[in-house]
Swiss-Prot record:
Record's protein name: Beta-ketoacyl-[acyl-carrier-protein] synthase III
UniProt-listed Enzyme Commission number(s): 2.3.1.180
One BP term from GO: fatty acid biosynthetic process
Cellular compartments annotated: Cytoplasm
InterPro entries in UniProt: ACP_syn_III_C, ACP_syn_III_N, FabH, Thiolase-like
Major location (coarse): cytoplasm
Stated family: Belongs to the thiolase-like superfamily. FabH family.
Length: 320
């Protein structure tokens, strides 16, 4: 039987750093206001790179680290809510740019759960026995979706990308999974478009900017998501580390208490990146492999958990 494993990781973020103090010069906010409520100190903002550019950078890194040629890839999956265009997909742009001529490619839109949903999908593709190698990338340029006068939302987000190479393995590496959606509670809205045609009344006004009910998302995370994670941990055993979506430091603090796990097991980097939606978990994973907290090819187990707009939430327990 075929199994799947994460064999390489990589991440990339734009060079432009925007601090809380920088934001205080263009909107009514302060470093103390942002940091005390979110833990975020700075974020990366793209100046001219689009989502596919960030994702392509990660794809090239993964190929270089693995020594694979792009022709050896069977698929490219990209999780994003900020694509370059409605079509082609970001994944298709990446596939074409890197020359993965034998790979199929598509995007997954599940907001901050997107990378977990994409990784779970890719694991099933390899486990089917039909495919052997593929890239799973989370990439966002959320700065282009924000109303920069809306301090409640604009201060939270940043741009970046991260991803993994998933390959066939003789051993099981994915030990637990829980994927969920509640479409009756949106919570996050981005790029709402009016319904306009020659036959519509034309009265609906579009709002192109991302909007978020932060309190509702916080309550959802610490109640519903923590319960889901706790159930998975009780069933499959406690992992070595928890890599949760990087939305808010207070969510991590509360989650640890709710799940009854040491806070030290919850890795964090939103201080430097802000909320990068689908990119947050793979960036966190890649950074902690780079600093040797996590070691690929070891027996370490990690729990990856995303939660956000949709509402969506999902967790995987993976041996890396």
């Amino acid at each position: 039987m075929a199994f799947a494993k994460i064999s390489q990781v990589a991440h990339y973020a734009p060079a432009q750093v925007v601090t809380n103090d920088d934001l205080s010069k263009i909107m009514d906010t302060s470093d103390e206001w942002i940091r005390s409520r979110t833990g975020i100190q700075e974020r990366r903002i793209s100046l001219n790179e689009n989502t596919s550019d960030l994702a392509t950078n990660v794809a090239y890194q993964l190929l270089e680290k693995s020594g694979l040629s792009p022709e050896e890839l069977d698929f490219v999956l990209v999780a994003t809510i900020s694509p370059d265009n409605s079509m082609p997909s970001v994944a298709a742009r990446v596939q074409g740019t890197i020359g993965a001529v034998n790979a199929f490619a598509f995007d997954i839109t599940a907001a901050c759960s997107g990378f977990v949903f994409a990784l779970a999908t890719a694991e099933k593709l390899i486990k089917s026995g039909a495919y052997k190698k593929g890239l799973v990338i989370g990439a966002e340029v959320l700065s282009k979706t924000l109303d920069w006068s809306d301090r409640a939302t604009a201060v939270l987000f940043g741009d970046g990308a991260g991803g993994v190479l998933l390959e066939e393995s003789e051993e099981e590496h994915f030990f637990g999974e829980s994927l969920n959606t509640d479409g009756s509670k949106g919570g996050l809205e981005s790029g709402a478009s009016a319904v306009i045609s020659p036959y519509s009344d034309g009265t609906e006004q579009p709002n192109p900017y991302m909007q978020m009910d932060g309190k509702a998302i916080f309550d959802f995370a610490v109640k519903t998501v923590s319960k889901s994670i706790k159930a998975l941990v009780e069933e499959k055993g406690e992992p070595d580390y928890f890599l949760l979506h990087q939305a808010n430091i207070r969510i991590l603090d509360t989650m640890a208490k709710k799940i009854d796990v040491s806070r030290d097991k919850f890795l964090a980097n939103m201080m430097s990146y802000g909320n990068t939606s689908a990119a947050s978990i793979p960036i966190l994973l890649s950074e902690n492999v780079a600093n040797e907290t996590l070691k690929l090819g070891s027996d370490q187990t990690i729990l990856l958990s995303g939660f956000g707009g949709g509402l969506t939430w999902g967790s995987l327990i993976v041996k890396i």
